[in-house]
Amino acid sequence: MINSTKGYIDQNGLAAKQFVQTKQLSVIRLTFMVAAFGIFFIFLVALTVQQLLSRSTLIDLASDFRTLSTIAVITSFVSLILYFVTAFKLRNPNTSLTWFWALIITDVISYGITLGILLTLATTFSKQVNFEANDIVYAFLGASLVFGSVWGLSALPSQKRRYQQTQTLFHILLWAFVISIVASLLSFILNFTVFASTTNLLDRIIPGLSLIVGGIFSLISVYFVSLQIRNEQDLIKYYESEDYEMARRQSWRSALFFGAWLISSFMNLVYFILRIILITKNFSRV
């Protein structure tokens, strides 16, 4: 019995060691894998919302918009609370992954509902609001181009470093923070200066999500950057002490937390680009 238990522990430890050491499941790839799946499920939620709204009558549609927008804003604030909670729990080795999965799920629900409403407007009321599905596609392509460029540029200086996966991840998250806070600040400035007299589609549908939540998220991202530095030190400590099981758990906690951060940063940038597209179209229409 003792030998079988010891064999199980050795086998489990070997699996954990292989998990950490393999290049295909490094921290940075794990983080981007989480973010990619999160964005994929955002699209699934958005398409589901679009299908539900497409079955509503014109009379019920306005009420459905308000209800779904309220749910989106509430879940976005719940997501912010979970960011704070999981940030404090990230470095605790006994923290359950449930907290981090909850963070991902609330992000997916919030951004998925918002995107579903926008898809409905773009497909059903495109002429009335001067808004098309192509605008959403261009916004996603623009955000993907920015984040892809940041990923490529961030990977260049870290090729010769010993722990390049965590160093590269830190650079990407740092730039994600810069992109997010600049987009939120520009949105805030434009709303109260140049475009104070114009009504924007995103402001009518989700004012809290486009400004308040984006601004708060950008501010707490300052703390996330410093948190990543300490988290990187924890991972290096586990690697050097050959505590591979703990390193694996910490890698998953890190991937889920910072993957959620990448999802939020990416979607904030998408909405900002979409905002600029709509403003440009409104000006050209005038």
From Swiss-Prot:
Keywords: Cell membrane, Membrane, Transmembrane, Transmembrane helix
Cellular localisation: Cell membrane
Protein name per Swiss-Prot or TrEMBL: Uncharacterized protein MG320
Organism: Mycoplasma genitalium (strain ATCC 33530 / DSM 19775 / NCTC 10195 / G37)
Predominant cellular place of this UniProt entry's protein: membrane
GO cellular component term, pick one: plasma membrane
Superkingdom, natural source: Bacteria
Signal peptide: none
Coiled-coil residues: none
